[in-house]
Amino acid sequence: MKVDGGLGLSPNIEKIAKEARSQEERGYDGIWTAETSHDPFLPLTIAAEHTQNLELGTSIAVAFARNPMVLANIGWDLQALSKGRFNLGLGSQIKPHITKRFSMEWSKPAARMREMVSAMRAIWNTWMTGEKLEFRGDFYTHTLMTPFFTPDKGDLGDFGAPKVYLAGVGELMTQVAGEVCDGFIAHGFTTEKYLREVTLPNLAIGREKAGK
C-alpha cells in the first residue's frame, strides 16, 4: 500500500521545499496539491526540484478552466522536471465556478472531459512521435503544431507522458475515468457504500468500453 501526503489547501510558498523534503524523508510515497486559493502546479515545480523519489500530483487541477494544449504543456514540463514522477489529476468543478469564476463554457461535462483527455494525449503523441496533429472533436480542435512550438521529445527521456487521473462523483464522469484515464480520484465525502455500489461498477463500465 502506498501512503501519500499533501501540501494543504493553501501552501506557504516559502515552506514548500522544506515540507516536500520532510515528507520524502518520512517515507511518504507521493505529495499532492489542490487548486483552491492558489495555483496547483507551482508548488509541485518547487517540490520536484527538492525531492528525488516522491510522486507528484494535482488533486485536483480544474480541467475546464484550461484547454487541452495548456494542460499538455504543463503536464509535459512537470513530467520532464520531475523525471517521470508527475501525475496530472483533473476535475470538472461545478457549473457556477466554471461559468462565473473562470468565465469558461460549460456543457456536457462528461463528454467534454473525455474529449479533453483524448485531445491532450493526441498532443503528447505528436510531440513524442512527430506525427501530424489532427484532433477534431465536438468541443476541441487541434490541427496546428509547428516545430517552433514543439517541445524536444528528449525532454521526457524514457518516462513517457504523465499519467492522467480524473476526479468524479457521478456515474458518467466515473465511466470516463475508467475509459480514458490512468486512475481515479474519489471525492473526500464518498462513502464506502457509494464506492462499492456506484463508483467501482462505473469504473468497470468505462474500462470495458476501452477494452481494458
Segments predicted by a language model, with ranges:
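N-terminal beta1-alpha1-beta2 module of alpha/beta enzyme domains
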Residues: 1-58, 64, 162
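Hydrophobic faces of well-ordered beta-strands that scaffold small-molecule active sites
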Residues: 3-7, 31-33, 56-59, 86-90, ...
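Glycine-enriched alpha-helix->loop->beta-strand junction motifs that scaffold or abut catalytic
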Residues: 27-29, 50-54, 82, 176-185
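An acidic- and aromatic-residue-enriched active-site/binding cleft used to recognize and process polar
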Residues: 36, 61, 93, 189
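Short gly/pro/ser/thr-enriched loop/turn and capping motifs at secondary-structure boundaries
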Residues: 39, 63-67, 96, 192-194
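Structural motif corresponding to the early beta-alpha repeats
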Residues: 58-70, 74
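Internal, glycine-rich beta/alpha segment that forms the wall or movable "lid"
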Residues: 72-183, 190-211
